[in-house]
Amino acid sequence: MITEAIAKIVKGENLDKEMAAAVMDEIMSGEATQAQIGSFLTALHIKGETIDEITAFAEIMRKHCGEFTPGVDEEIDIVGTGGDCAGTFNISTVSSLVTAAGGGKVAKHGNRAASSKCGTADCLEALGVNIAADCKVSEACLKDLGTCFLFAQKYHTAMRFVGAPRKEIKIPTVFNILGPLANPAKANLQLLGVYDASLVDPLAKVLSNLGVKRGMVVHGNDGLDEISAVTTTTICEFNDGTFNTYTLDPTAYGFTLCDKAELVGGTPEENAQIAKDILSGKITDGKRTAVILNAGAALHITNRISLEEGFALAADILANGSGLKKLEDFIAATNA
C-alpha cells in the first residue's frame, strides 16, 4: 500500500482516509522499509498534509500505542508541537501542574527534548518525578491527584520504525505534529500549541475529528507554540464541533507584555528550578505571566469558566502555593 500511496502523492494527489490509515498501519507494524518510509514522508511534506490524512495517521498511532485507561470523565492535555526553536522553559509542564491544582484532570503526554535543551520528560525527571511509572500508577495519579505523565517512549514503541528515516531526511515531517495528537489517554479536552500559524485551524478540526470535545489550538504571533506573554496569540477555540478563531491580547486582560528573552530556559536542572520558583511564587516576571496565560486557558477549558476567571484562578494558585504542593504529591506518588 505504501508504494501506491507514494505514487499518488508524487502526482500531487491526496490520500483518502482509508489509504492513509493503511499506510500508517504498515509503518507502525514494521512492514514498510526505511527507504519507503523516507520517500513517503518526503513526498507528503512536499505535497502538504490534509486534515483527513492527519486524522487517519493519528487514529492509527493511537491504535498502536500502549493501553491507558483514564478512569475520569474528562481529561486535558496541555502540549506543544515543538519546533518553534525558542528555547523557552517548560511552560506547558508548569501550566499542567497549575491546572491540576485548579481542579482540572491533566493527562500530560510528552517526551525528551527534540528541538530544545529540555523536554517535558527531562524537566519532570529533574524535578524528581518517576517518568517511567507503571501504567496503573499513572492511572491512579490521574484519578486521585488530577495529573499524570505519559512518557511517549514508553507508550509509542512502534515509533522505533520511523526514527532512522526521520533523522536521515532531516526535514520536518507529519510526525512533528502527530505526537501531540496521539495521547495514550485519548484526552477529550486539549490545549495544543503549534509552531506555525497555518496549522491553527486545520489542527482544531483534526482534534475535533479525533473526538476532542473542547479545546484550543494556539500560536503565539512571535512564533511560540504556546499562548504568548510577549505579543498576541492566534487561537482557534472549539466546542462540540463549533469553531471560533480569534486573537488574544494579554494586555486586554491587564497583563504587561514581556521580552522573549525572559522566557528562555536552559538545562533540565535549570528548568526544574524555574518550575519550582514559579510554583512557589519566587518568580514574578514574564515567566509567571506565561504560566498564568496558559494554565488559565486550560482552566477555561476544563472548568467551563471564562478566560478572565481562568487567569484569576491560575494567579491565585501561584500565590497560595497549591501548585507546588501538587508537584510534591505527584513526585511522591510516582516514586511510592
Where are each of the predicted segments found?
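A glycine-rich phosphate/pyrophosphate-binding beta-strand-loop-alpha-helix module
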Residues: 41, 89-145
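Core alpha/beta catalytic barrel or barrel-like domain that forms the active/cofactor pocket
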Residues: 69-79, 107-113, 175-181
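Short beta-strand segments at enzyme active-site cores
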Residues: 36-37, 107-109, 217
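Gly/Ser/Thr-rich beta-alpha loop segments that engage phosphate groups in nucleotides
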Residues: 14, 84-85, 112, 121, ...
